[in-house]
Amino acid sequence: MTTVHPGTTSVSLPTQSTYQSRVADYWNAEENPVNLELGKLDDLYHHHYGIGDADRSVLDEPDPGLRRELITRELHRLEQAQAELLASRLGPLSPEDRVFDAGCGRGGGSVVAHQRYGCHTDGVTISAKQADFANDQARQRGIDAKVRYHHRNMLDTGLATGGYAASWNNESTMYVELDLLFAEHARLLRRGGRYVVITGCYNDTYGRASREVSLINAHYICDIHPRSEYFRAMARNRLVPVHVEDLTPATLPYWELRSEADHLVTGIEDAFVTAYKNGSFQYLLIAADRV
């Protein structure tokens, strides 16, 4: 018998292909310390990377246990800075507004948006385990009346057309076809609504996807898109960019520090560092208005 958290709503087909089922299986089974140990610090669980200058003095701590704790806190500070940057690009928003978190993971980004604006948030994840976890966290925080998570497909959410003032993807676009994704965002957003994405993409000027990008794809069972495809797909789906920011230099310190965190590494760190340094991979923020 399957028990469903009362805060989770389901649709009949959260996964609509064999590939999507494999992605759901991956995230239902995922227990990486780099996600869980950082989130335990303040119950803000993120599934994205960090930005900003890292305090590398944490590596000088001689006590192994304290060193691990300091590194964990510093990495979490950097990933929280990334979440705050994304949230800052969603506004201005009011407490009456509703926002949509596509590929919400364990829910940290929706909480950050709610804390900043007081708004209603709907997060969607293909992982039933993540939706249950995120709803439980919202209930423990006492914000479950306004912050809710759903076990649904972000390409076919079933949520209200034109009901959202803002929406975003934070490192989840590489699991889907961009035209299908942006069509759903355009449907959900009211006219003038804001869409924000932070994502890794391969650099068209490099040529094709590099070896390192291919390794990242294999590691996460994803398909990283070229930078150019984001802008083409947005144009086809009534999303007009108003701000583009290259976060590649800002995320490199996070990856360099993480690569030295023996208790948190997943084995993909060197591929990220190399790809960012050789120019084949970029980390972008794009904000767009729905017209």
Predicted regions and their residues:
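N-terminal auxiliary segments of SAM/dcSAM-dependent transferases
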Residues: 2-48
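Conserved alpha-helix/loop element of class I SAM-dependent methyltransferases that forms part
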Residues: 55-62, 76-97
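Class I SAM-dependent methyltransferase SAM/SAH-binding core
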Residues: 98-100, 109-156
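A short acidic, Gly/Pro-enriched loop at the edge of an enzyme's catalytic core
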Residues: 155-167
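A short glycine-rich, Lys/Arg-flanked "PGG" loop and its adjoining helix->strand segment in the class I
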Residues: 179-194
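Short, glycine-/aromatic-enriched active-site segment of Class I SAM-dependent methyltransferases
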Residues: 200-221
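Short alpha-helix
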Residues: 222-238
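Conserved catalytic loop of SAM-dependent methyltransferase domains
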Residues: 243-265
